[in-house]
Amino acid sequence: MFVRLGAALCAAAIIFSCSSAMAESGIASVYAHGGGRTASGERVNSRELTAAHRSLPFGTHVRVTNRRNGRSVIVRINDRGPFVRGRVIDLTPAAAHALGFSGLVRVNLEIVRT
């Protein structure tokens, strides 16, 4: 009986931790380093669908959805940031254009694959 209860609790903990790590919401901003390098060592390309996130592994693909208009785009994490309170992701101008915004916007994030 205790084994079943323990297994059920472990399964619930795994499901809860996975679901909470899979989604995030907050403010997205647009950034471009002007040809510099990202934290992953890549050259910044404002025409690519890439982004900066504080903790997701480099190479993670994230669906970003603009909460204002419902548009979404899949970006690849290749940099670190944003380092401004309340912001959850920095997007290249190409990704921001695909989402239909400039400046700041409220977004939902969902990990597509790591």
Residue ranges: model-predicted function:
Residues F2-T114:
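Secreted/periplasmic proteins
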